[in-house]
Amino acid sequence: QTPAAGAGGVPAGSYALTGPIVNVADGDTVTLRAPGGQRRIRMDSIDAPEEGHGNEQPGQPFAQASRQHLAGLVAGKTLTAQCYERDQFDRDVCALILPDGRSANRAQVEAGYAWAYTARRGDYLRDPAMPGLQRQAREAGRGLWAQSGAIEPWKWRYDCWRQRRC
């Protein structure tokens, strides 16, 4: 880990991890092989459709498409993750920077394969551009916005997985 600058919306006191992306678990979680070992990265400011976890936790529409879109952007590429904390699952919470300097997090939202993570009054939203990017994707009918009735992943986890109202 090396200290990272507070530029580009990344908080001061953050840290950078650099290495190849060796796994794309879903539309907002990847594994990066850093010099000290593999690190699970939870992409900040976004929440992608949930993959299924057996019969008790069915997946959301567009979960596979979201994972595939992210894989097309990052799989096998050496990237820098600008990180600022670890979450309750011991994942580094980061912005993934693509080789051209763009944010993979923003690219997921722009393409309509993730939501701006506005749950809990925006507690998880670090990038203030995300709601506007989501609005543009929705208005253009991109990705999951191509069909009506899209349910935010945080609502899906509660309603479907906890309350069994899928």
Where are these regions (language model features)?
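Small beta-barrel nucleic-acid-binding modules, primarily SNase/OB-fold domains
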Residues: 1-166
